[in-house]
């Protein structure tokens, strides 16, 4: 027997508790109430699920910033690269990545300073914004709060989103945000058909394109899917759609021009696709298809499995006879199918044989929403399944919290160890024999030095306009790792600089009891000997 003590507030979540009688536990009932609150109720004027997500992101910004400040640690690989490049606004930054994430980092740093706080605001602002846009789009299409919550928390079932994007990755997180914003903008076009809606759709299209270049797959798939449905085709053929096209082109034009004039920088990472590594055309195609299937399973396998198990757990619940899905659901399924087809064609036509799991993000970002919409038509069985998805997504997000805090302080192995270096000590040793305005290294770990001196110029071998960016006095700083140094030596020479004959080795402390306790760094002053040679500007 169970007795309820206290109440349940729809504004502030579960406030009562259950009293144990006859030795029976009530944890399950309490968790079900909490899940229902996340799905259907409000926290003040906001949906409870949205409030949970926003609070989660705020907590992450505060805890990660304060813990790093307390420990004196730096940032990991991807965010140290942002520290290096976000010093200036530019149409492009190299590394085969579009500039939008860096623009946001630059803007935030101009408001709160070049700091860990700035980068965490960008990261978790994008995560919260993307999840909120995703939720809102599903609701605007007429589906239930429960479906919208299941779609939003369903995104957190992807390990690449709930885990990898919290301790690494930058531009992939921009895909989550701006693909969701584009989804919402399309919904607004279909609902309102106003000039403002079409203009915002153009801006959202540009933002999605400038988040990461492989997001063109999502753009193309969503466009073709909209053309394939009678209910959405009319909005695309509306002459006001030209407003969207013009706005998108104008917003992307500076980066498009930069890309065409910096093709070498744009394609600098193209060897990562493993093009034509199979030898013959048939072998290459086989490797490509196998790699694609493996990437699909690694990326989407877990969320699909969780949705399937959640559905099986609700199998005893009643459900009406199956009916064809409404047009919004058809739109999403078709977008996913077209994205898969486009990806397969690119693999076969381009001879791609190597994949990273996160490259599947533009293909499957609409999958949780499509599944949540399907469940909305399944009565009590669908409601139960949606609740399970919300519960699992929320629990996974909370379980990740302490691990993400650990990674923020300790980093990983190999390159990730740069987090634990004492950059204040390194900066003091760099400037012990005179001021330094530019630090050059073979890769972007040295971007962390801008946490100590925001005015410092930090360059690596992939920075465009390398020669023009150097401000004297300049030093070359090389770490005791296995990174090749020949490229940076070549760029220094072409920029008209020579290395001093004196190479100073300094021991940089590693924090938090790391072993070995220090890392060896070689510091060499650079001297101007000639003007930059042809080709040194890029």
Predicted regions and their residues:
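Membrane-proximal, lumen/periplasm-facing interface regions of secretory-pathway glyco-
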Residues: 350-357, 379-434, 442-458, 480, ...
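Aromatic/acidic, Gly/Pro-rich catalytic loop(s) in extracytoplasmic/lumenal soluble domains
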Residues: 6, 467-538
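Transmembrane-helix motifs of polytopic, lipid-linked glycan transferases
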Residues: 121-142, 157, 162, 180-185
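Short acidic/glycine- and proline-prone juxtamembrane loop motifs at membrane-interface regions
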Residues: 164-174
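Membrane-interface transmembrane helices that cradle and orient dolichyl/undecaprenyl
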Residues: 182-200, 375
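Short helix- or helix-capping micro-motifs
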Residues: 57, 151-160, 205, 209
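Hydrophobic/aromatic-rich transmembrane helices and adjacent perimembrane loops
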Residues: 326, 330, 334, 351-386
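Transmembrane-lumen/periplasm boundary regions of multi-pass, lipid-linked membrane glycan transferases
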Residues: 219-328
């Amino acid at each position: 027997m169970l007795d309820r003590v206290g109440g349940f507030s729809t504004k502030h979540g579960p406030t009562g508790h259950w009293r144990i009688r006859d030795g029976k536990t009530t944890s399950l009932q309490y968790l079900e109430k909490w899940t229902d609150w996340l799905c259907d109720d409000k926290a003040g004027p906001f949906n409870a699920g949205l409030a949970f997500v926003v609070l989660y992101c705020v907590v992450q910004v505060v805890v990660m910033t304060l813990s790093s400040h307390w420990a004196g640690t730096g940032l990991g690989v991807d965010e140290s690269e942002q520290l290096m490049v976000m010093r200036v606004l530019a149409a492009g930054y190299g590394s085969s990545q579009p500039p939008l994430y860096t623009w946001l980092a630059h803007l935030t740093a101009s408001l709160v300073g070049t700091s860990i706080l700035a980068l965490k605001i960008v990261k978790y602002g994008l995560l919260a914004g993307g999840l909120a846009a995703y939720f809102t789009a599903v609701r605007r299409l007429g589906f239930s709060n429960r479906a919208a919550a299941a779609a939003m928390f369903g995104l957190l079932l992807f390990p690449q989103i709930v885990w990898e994007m919290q301790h690494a990755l930058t531009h992939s997180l921009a895909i989550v945000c701006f693909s969701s914003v584009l989804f919402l903008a399309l919904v607004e076009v279909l609902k309102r058909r106003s000039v403002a809606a079409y203009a915002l759709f153009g801006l959202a299209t540009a933002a999605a394109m400038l988040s990461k270049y492989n997001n063109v797959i999502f753009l193309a798939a969503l466009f073709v899917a909209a053309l394939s449905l009678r209910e959405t085709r009319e909005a695309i053929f509306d002459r006001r759609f030209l407003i969207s096209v013009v706005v998108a082109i104008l917003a992307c034009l500076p980066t498009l021009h930069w890309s065409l004039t910096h093709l070498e920088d744009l394609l600098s990472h193209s060897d990562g696709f493993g093009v034509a590594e199979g030898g013959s055309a048939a072998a290459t195609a086989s490797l490509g298809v196998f790699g694609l299937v493996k990437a699909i399973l690694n990326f989407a396998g877990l969320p699909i499995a969780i949705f399937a198990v959640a559905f099986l757990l609700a199998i005893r619940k009643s459900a009406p006879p199956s009916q064809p899905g409404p047009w919004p659901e058809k739109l999403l399924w078709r977008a996913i199918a077209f994205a898969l087809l486009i990806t397969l064609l690119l693999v076969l036509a381009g001879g791609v044989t190597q994949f990273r799991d996160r490259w599947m993000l533009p293909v499957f970002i609409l999958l949780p929403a499509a599944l949540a919409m399907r469940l909305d038509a399944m009565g009590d069985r669908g409601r139960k399944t949606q609740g399970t998805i919300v519960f699992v997504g929320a629990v996974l997000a909370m379980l990740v919290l302490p691990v993400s805090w650990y990674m923020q302080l300790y980093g990983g192995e190999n390159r990730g160890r740069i987090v634990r270096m004492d950059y204040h000590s390194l900066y003091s040793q760099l400037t012990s024999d005179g001021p330094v305005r530019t630090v050059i290294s073979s890769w972007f770990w040295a971007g962390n030095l801008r946490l100590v001196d925001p005015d410092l110029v930090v360059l690596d071998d992939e920075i465009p306009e390398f020669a023009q960016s150097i401000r004297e006095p300049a030093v070359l700083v090389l770490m005791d790792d296995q990174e090749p140094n020949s490229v940076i030596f070549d760029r220094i020479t072409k920029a008209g600089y020579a290395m001093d004959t004196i190479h100073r080795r300094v021991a940089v402390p590693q924090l938090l009891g790391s072993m070995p306790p220090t890392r060896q760094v070689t510091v060499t002053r650079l001297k101007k000997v000639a003007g930059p040679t042809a080709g040194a500007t890029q």
